[in-house]
Amino acid sequence: MRNKKDWTQLMEKLVISVGVTGSRITREQTPYIPITAAEIAQSGIEAWRAGASVLHIHVRDPKTGLGTQNYEIFKEVVDRIRGETDAILCLTTSGIPGRNLEFRERLVPLTFQPELVSFDAGSVNMRENVFLNPPEFLEL
């Protein structure tokens, strides 16, 4: 039987990516989901302190709890996380499922020059909604 020291020496490097909120889960489904910019940033910072190196970030409208691509909310989250961590940020360009936003709104996260962005390369059916990714968006 291996002792702990031997086991840790055999481990390979690992990248842990954390999706702090996603875009669909609500407080009605779980009271623990971060909604405000401060809550989302704090959850990301805590995940980084626990060992995550990549933080996949969606932001929420604090009034509705729903996903948004609002510049000011993204800015607050990004500034707070960058102020306390060296985490790799993966910001979403997917927008909000069921609300097909204008392309310029979906590209707001690029203004923060994240190390990574999520980019859905095709349209997706999500229950009663269709998440559109037409060629005009994909070719931007």
Where do the protein language model's features map onto the residues?
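Conserved, mostly hydrophobic/aromatic
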Residues: 40, 47, 58, 117
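Histidine-centered catalytic micro-motifs
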Residues: 18, 37, 54-64
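Hydrophobic faces of well-ordered beta-strands that scaffold small-molecule active sites
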Residues: 16-20, 55-57, 87-93, 115-119
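Alpha-helix-loop-beta-strand connector modules within alpha/beta enzyme cores
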Residues: 65-91, 139-140
